[in-house]
Amino acid sequence: MDRDTFDSAIRTFKHRTPFQPFTIAMVNGVRLEVDYPDALAVRDGAALYFAPGGIPVLFDYEGVSQVAGDLAERH
């Protein structure tokens, strides 16, 4: 994913009103399920995600393959 698409997609999903959970799919197969908007901070193509339990995950646009929809729709 390119840097501009990454920044735009993350910000769009993070700031939806009302907030809806979304998934960030990494190129290595890891999936980050963002269920709270403040669990994710984004700046200049890099992001910090706080996974359940407060575990920090640092990643950038080069490691992301897709940012996708609403987790609730898949249950």
Describe the role of every protein-language-model region.
Residues 1-75:
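Motif-centric detector for short Cys/His coordination patterns
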